[in-house]
């Protein structure tokens, strides 16, 4: 299922994860889709300001937060250019990783400018990020190695840091049974099990650089094997991110074991 660039009409009343209250002292990881930083998106500066405020507020409540940022349009464009002369997936992945680290730097510097206690460097590995998250309240990173999308990196960071959940903030309203661009009758889901999500996105196999799906299948496989809950939502509405972090109802899909 590919990323969807428009809000879908089949939105229902916000849903709340049962038995999870993230009022204070929580560790949460957020996977921010690179599309949220696209330069052509209107009011992107307002979105960034809202996101920074949300993170600052959660840190003030005692949370520790890892943020993993995708490459978005810069990654896809760079990969498209290079693919004319490069056919090795690992080499193309490295181009995408560079774009994710650029986007991560934008988020990190914005947080630092607002006085949020964020780690001073962009980690190059999940293990490094875990160490940083033990020292600072917020860590921002991009991709790490070829074959691992930022969804996968975020879920791995959530697992290794003992996070309560991983929030997948993308440009998709919910998880659908099929891509609604291809099938207008595709069914939106308020909730799924991890196994059901794996069945929708496909087997946990890397599908090449620059791919765009609601959640990367490899990352879902990691979530399945570690029973890591996922909140999947349209991050273009920053309020949905806030609601998820606060453990409140939000418009999106709750995925649990």
Q: Language-model features: where?
A:
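C-terminal catalytic "cap/lid" subdomain
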Residues: 6-7, 11-257
């Amino acid at each position: 299922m590919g990323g969807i660039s428009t809000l879908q009409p089949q939105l229902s009343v916000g849903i709340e994860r049962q038995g999870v209250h993230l009022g204070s002292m929580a560790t949460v990881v957020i996977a921010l889709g690179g599309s949220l930083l696209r330069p052509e998106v209107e009011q992107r500066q307002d979105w960034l300001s809202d996101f920074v405020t949300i993170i600052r507020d959660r840190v003030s409540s005692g949370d520790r937060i890892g943020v993993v940022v995708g490459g978005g349009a810069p990654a896809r464009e760079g990969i498209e250019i290079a693919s004319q002369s490069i056919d090795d997936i690992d080499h193309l992945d490295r181009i995408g990783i560079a774009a994710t680290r650029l986007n991560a730097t934008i988020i990190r510097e914005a947080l630092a400018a607002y006085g949020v206690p964020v780690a001073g460097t962009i980690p190059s590995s999940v293990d490094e990020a875990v160490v940083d998250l033990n020292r600072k309240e917020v860590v921002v990173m991009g991709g790490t190695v070829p074959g691992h999308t930022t969804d996968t990196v975020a879920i791995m960071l959530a697992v290794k840091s003992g996070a309560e959940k991983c929030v997948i903030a993308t440009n998709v309203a919910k998880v659908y049974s099929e891509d609604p661009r291809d099938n207008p009758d595709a069914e939106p889901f308020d909730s799924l099990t991890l196994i059901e999500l794996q069945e929708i996105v496909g087997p946990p196999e890397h599908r090449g650089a620059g791919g765009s799906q609601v959640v990367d299948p490899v990352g879902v496989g990691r979530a399945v094997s570690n029973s890591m809950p996922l909140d999947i939502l349209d991050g273009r509405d920053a309020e949905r991110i806030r609601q998820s972090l606060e453990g409140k109802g939000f418009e999106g899909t709750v995925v649990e074991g």
